Swiss-Prot record:
The lineage of its organism: Bacteria, Pseudomonadati, Pseudomonadota, Gammaproteobacteria, Enterobacterales. Belongs to the NAD-dependent DNA ligase family. LigA subfamily. The gene is ligA. This is DNA ligase. InterPro entries: BRCT_dom (IPR001357), BRCT_dom_sf (IPR036420), DisA/LigA_HHH (IPR041663), DNA_ligase (IPR001679), DNA_ligase_AS (IPR018239), DNA_ligase_CS (IPR033136), DNAligase_adenylation (IPR013839), DNAligase_N (IPR013840). GO terms for cellular component: cytosol. NAD(+) binds at D32, A33, E34, Y35, D36, S81, L82, E113, R136, E173, K290, K314. The active site is at K115 (n6-amp-lysine intermediate). Residues 593-671 form the BRCT domain.
Length: 671
């Protein structure tokens, strides 16, 4: 069994390691709750054995050393931390200690605030002008982040109003709203940049940039919650009064600050904020409870690292540690393949979590995740639990690499991942069980095969009863089988069969659109049909040949090529043709022989038309030898702009492409 000295040494070493990762490297390896637990364990041992307390123990200081890359600023008034409580019993004990220490019948009013999950900073104003800003650092010395703080729009560079002190040091939290955090990570995933585990890390990473121009691009904000240095003026004698004065001078203060007249009211505030937490739009990890009276604060004083008149009442942790037992792959309704971590069940924010999303192969690589790893799980609000980082220092020897599938785990079709896209997808859109309902609903829709009377509820039942597996099975349905569906009498069933029979006669463009090839909309389908003319020619086309079609680039060409390369898709198409699906033979139009101003031109329609439908306009243009594309590019010859034309019109003007309105189009069609 370890001696007390050994236990203390091990705890202090572990805490120092994690303080370094958190404060210096901005790369925490464990959640806050685990750090708090280790600190409580150390404090309890030191309380029982005060003779073993050392000056360098983590309990005897506030934080960690500042980053060496920044110059340092010494705090004239130390920036202390707060003690924490984690349950009602502990808070009520804190309340009693305050009442007992005051030794009077004087009532205590509490000022309650949100405990923001960001980076604590101090900002010094001289004669109302911002002159410096620093991080907390070790509580005595912080990093000089003046240039970066000046880029935060919420922080005034000059205070306004009356009676502004000659020197005023305000303290508060710089943080990143959730919407901004999500955008930063979205951009990082797209460009291959650093992805942050949570908004707090993103805020710290943004504020500790050596180049202020990078900080300026991050949507950081700030709430003020206290004061350090004060010279040349007086402030109100209550904490809330001071916050309201700061607000008058132009400093942002949270609108959730609330006065509570009793411990019971504090508990009501705590639970109300906990309930509202998912809708705030930014991360908090508890509430801060402060004695409102400055006179009472002075009476209560401080301990070594924290005031006796304030406490942080923390919420149940949103992050916990557990082990990855396996990684499985789910297929979504659009064919997207998502890796899911199967976890050793753990309670996170009051919910038992056994699964967590891993997003995609890039995310697994970024995390360096292996099966068997110890990981940190985060669950914020209603967000699906996710793995935020791996505890590499505790990786087991028998951990296994995660192997991303090359074939769909549902149908066995090839997995496609287009260059530049993070998501891998199943190419078996016509046979994949995971995509079945959505692909069938698309196939029968009005702009595709246009099967009258076959709505979503009928498709749902057909799939659930396993009457239909592929689009070809639709044309094998009988009235007798359909009458087995809910609310489907003999007459309605026969109407559906008749509609299916009618739908067999279609166009090549509609048929291509109905197949649901990724990113092949109506315009692209029409372009492919017009260019290749026959299904056989399209199936045999290379990626290079496909890119010759107007509006088709490398990405769409890859999707089309991969779709027809999948044997299961070709088999379903053969079945559809065998069931009688057909379209007229192509009419070869030689643009040179057509006397029309549109002949041989690539045309784009944008905005709404008042004199004819867009479909009719497309049909007339194709008849007159035009190629109708869905987007504007350098290949575009002409843009027809209807009412409320948007980005396509702007791009055409930017590229110097000819633009005409609907009236001119009608005149030219008539000519």
């Amino acid at each position: 069994m370890e001696s007390i000295e050994q236990q203390l040494t091990e705890l202090r070493t572990t805490l120092r390691h994690h303080e370094y990762l958190y404060h210096v490297m901005d790369a925490p390896e464990i959640p806050d709750a685990e750090y708090d637990r280790l600190m409580r364990e150390l404090r309890e041992l030191e309380t029982k054995h005060p003779e073993l307390i050392t000056p360098d123990s983590p309990t005897q200081r506030v934080g960690a050393a500042p980053l060496a890359a920044f110059s340092q600023i010494r705090h004239e008034v130390p920036m202390l931390s707060l003690d924490n409580v984690f349950d009602e019993e502990s808070f009520l004990a804190f309340n009693k200690r305050v009442q007992d220490r005051l030794k009077s019948n004087e009532k205590v009013t509490w000022c309650c605030e949100l405990k923001l999950d960001g980076l604590a900073v101090s900002i010094l104003y001289e004669n109302g002008v911002l002159v410096s800003a620093a991080t907390r650092g070790d509580g005595t010395t912080g990093e000089d982040i003046t240039s970066n703080v000046r880029t935060i729009l919420a922080i005034p560079l000059k205070l306004h109003g009356e009676n502004i002190p000659a020197r005023l040091e305000v303290r508060g939290e710089v943080f990143l709203p959730q919407a901004g955090f999500e955008k930063i990570n979205e951009d990082a995933r797209r460009t291959g940049g650093k992805v942050f585990a949570n908004p707090r890390n993103a805020a710290a990473g943004s504020l500790r940039q050596l180049d202020p121009r990078i900080t300026a691009k991050r949507p950081l904000t700030f709430f003020c919650y206290g004061v350090g240095v004060l010279e040349g003026s007086e402030l109100p004698d209550t904490h809330l009064g001071r916050l309201l004065q700061f607000k008058k001078w132009g400093l942002p203060v949270s609108d959730r600050v609330t006065l509570c007249e009793s411990a019971e009211e504090v508990l009501v505030f705590y639970h109300k904020v906990e309930e509202d937490r998912p809708t705030l739009g930014f991360d908090i990890d508890g509430v801060v409870i402060k004695v409102n009276s400055l006179a009472q604060q002075e009476q209560l004083g401080f301990v070594a690292r924290a005031p006796r008149w304030a406490v942080a009442f923390k919420f149940p942790a949103q992050e916990q540690m557990t082990f990855v037992r396996d990684v499985e792959f789910q297929v979504g309704r659009t064919g997207a393949i998502t890796p899911v971590a199967r976890l050793e069940p753990v309670h996170v924010a009051g919910v038992l979590v056994s699964n967590a999303t891993l997003h995609n192969a890039d995310e697994i690589e970024r995390l360096g995740l292996r099966i068997g790893d110890k990981v940190v799980i985060r669950r914020a609000g209603d967000v699906i639990p996710q793995v935020v980082n791996v505890v590499l220092s505790e990786r087991p020897e028998d951990s296994r690499e995660v192997v991303f599938p090359t074939h769909c785990p549902v149908c066995g079709s090839d997995v496609e991942r287009v260059e530049g896209e993070a998501v891998a997808r199943c190419t078996g859109g016509l046979i994949c069980g995971a995509q079945r309902k959505e692909s069938l609903k698309h196939f029968v829709s009005r702009r595709a095969m246009d099967v009258d009377g076959m709505g979503d509820k009928i498709i749902d039942q057909l799939v659930e009863k396993e009457y239909v597996h592929t689009p070809a099975d639709l044309f094998k349905l009988t009235a007798g089988k359909l009458t087995g569906l809910e609310r489907m009498g003999p007459k309605s069933a026969q109407n559906v069969v008749n509609a299916l029979e009618k739908a067999k006669e279609t166009t090549f463009a509609r048929f291509l659109y109905a197949l649901g090839i990724r990113e092949v909309g109506e315009a692209t389908a029409a372009g492919l049909a017009a260019y290749f003319g026959t299904l056989e020619a399209l199936e045999a086309a290379s990626i290079e040949e496909l890119q010759k079609v107007p509006d088709v680039g490398i990405v769409v060409a890859s999707h089309v090529h991969n779709f027809f390369a999948e044997e299961s898709n070709r088999n379903v198409i053969s079945e559809l043709l065998a069931e009688g699906v057909h379209w007229p033979a192509p009419i070869v139009i030689n643009a040179e022989e057509i006397d029309s101003p549109f002949a041989g031109k690539t045309v784009v329609l944008t905005g709404s038309l008042s004199q004819m439908s867009r479909d009719d306009a497309k049909a007339r243009l194709v008849e007159l030898g035009a190629k109708v594309a869905g987007s504007v590019s350098k290949k575009t010859d002409l843009v027809i702009a209807g009412e409320a034309a948007g980005s396509k019109l702007a791009k055409a003007q930017e590229l110097g492409i000819e633009v005409i309105d609907e009236a001119e189009m009608l005149r030219l069609l008539g000519s």
